[in-house]
Amino acid sequence: MGEFPGYFELDKFWQQDFLYPLIFQEYIYALAHDHVLNRFILLDNFGYDNKSSSLVVKRLITRMCQQNHLIISANDSNQNPLWGHNKNLYSQIISEGFAVIVEIPFSLRLVAYVERKEIVKSQNQNLRSIHSIFPFLEDNFVHLNYVSDILIPYPIHLELEVQTLRSWFKDASFLHLLRFLLYEYQNCNRLSTLTPKKSISIVSKSNQRFFLFLYNSYVCEYESIFIFLCNQSSHLRSTSFGTLVERIYFYGKRETLVEVVSNDFSLVLWLCKNPLMHYVRYQGKAILASKGTPLLMKKWKYYLVNFWQCHLSVWSNPVRIHINQLSNHSFGFLGYLASVRVNRSMVRSQMLE
């Protein structure tokens, strides 16, 4: 048993202001303040062929804030079916342009990480084929005893997304615009339940890039701390984790010192050291395999549940983590059902006189 320090290096890699506040500047606070749909909205519809850029986003914000003879009141939205469609179009293009801009620093960090790993250009373009995972499983999982099939929880409340990114980006304009887009999406979903035949329901299908950015930022927050503690507690092998690390779009080691709330983790930081443990994440699930005992796997299960609840404020049901013995159970991975075959051998001994 060992106790780990309550400090670790955390890379808040873009704490300075973004470029886009210099572009939008005077529009962001007015737009974020008015997210309850009580302002005037333009009636005319502008088609941009699903193309998003900072210039398009700025023009849309300008037209949404202007008032002329083409505007209608939000109270008249029930009488005019085109109002909701135009509002959704603006929110969609703004969120798409927002996602493009905020992906820039993450892309730069990914390129820097690839250069540090000295990956050749041909491999960099493909970012490690997914088929390389299966030889890894065949070579390593046959020597393991237990595997935990983990369903990664996702924050339900919108404000948790803002809190997660607040420690990454020290930019008030960024947080205001993010909060506006999230509440705008929530309002559209509420309206879609009342008017299912209208075009409001297309918002969830059209903003995939924006929500993919939010999901990856949340996963990066979770994995950066989790992998650090795994390295401290169980010597998680970099070669095992490296099979998927190039495919994690927002991976990066963190540099700024922050304090883990020691009171929250006082009961779960006591972990047994295990010389062999592997972690693999795919889609919204993860696999944690070990050569340890059932008690060790239960300790990790207890730790993960408390980690999500205490640090990320995400409630996780313990039944979402299944612990199985590889010799008796199989586990699903990337659409395949994997299991370990137990080879029984007969040993004969003869007494020598």
Curated annotation (Swiss-Prot):
Record's keyword terms, sorted: Chloroplast, mRNA processing, Plastid, RNA-binding, tRNA processing
Superkingdom of the organism of origin: Eukaryota
Molecular function via GO: RNA binding
Keyword Plastid: yes
GO process annotations (BP): mRNA processing; tRNA processing
Any single Gene Ontology cellular-component annotation: chloroplast
Location(s) in or outside the cell: Plastid, Chloroplast
Main location per the UniProt record: plastid
Coiled-coil stretches noted in the UniProt entry, renumbered to this chain: none
Record Pfam families: MatK_N
Keyword RNA-binding: yes
Function, as annotated: Usually encoded in the trnK tRNA gene intron. Probably assists in splicing its own and other chloroplast group II introns.
Family stated for the protein in its record: Belongs to the intron maturase 2 family. MatK subfamily.
Protein name: Maturase K
Source organism of the structure: Saxifraga mertensiana
